[in-house]
Amino acid sequence: MTGVQTCALPILSLLTVIIVFGVVFWSSRKMTIKPKGKQNVLEFIYEFVNSTISQSLGKFTKNYSLLLFVIFTFVFTANNLGLLVSVKSEHYNFWTSPTSNFGVTITLSLIITLISHIEGIRKKGFKGYLKGYLSPYPAMLPMNILEQLTNLASLALRLFGNIYSGEVLTGLILKLVTWSVFAAPVSFALNLVWVAFSAFIGFIQAYVFIILSSNYIGDKVNEE
């Protein structure tokens, strides 16, 4: 919501972590060889992430599948947390999606960027890693460095922009209630539709985030 300060972001981010950990822990208890119920859902999500990133990571898919599974579930949950309730005062927003805050999305982007560069050095060695910046020829060095910076920024801004704008529109729809008693049913109906659409957008953005993350990591660890 424009102009409204978020005062509970650390708590909501921690809540997202607790929800993800709790659901995964609960779903993975008493696992059987033939999955069923909650285990089946958990394995389906893991296989979905695994198949999504395999094209970018190739033979290294298994090395990063668990990491990107955790990131996918965290981002998806964080994207949709703000859809559950609306708790705010004139100056503070007490309940919002953590990923509607740029600080959260840039932190996630920095984590992926740091991992990709560390893994690139580990897999190719420092000389092999630096050689990538001189490809296809040394004059491309400034452009290759700029590309890394734009990748970092775009990964954060894409997620932040989509989730933040969704919450702004949700707030505007809910304000229809204050206009007139006759606007309340319209506001309620529009809000239901928009919440459903926002949940879908939250999934798409989590999906795009792990695709781009796997691309950035794969670009560093795969052979040229």
Region spans (language model):
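Short, exposed "boundary/linker" segments that immediately precede the start
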Residues: 1-3
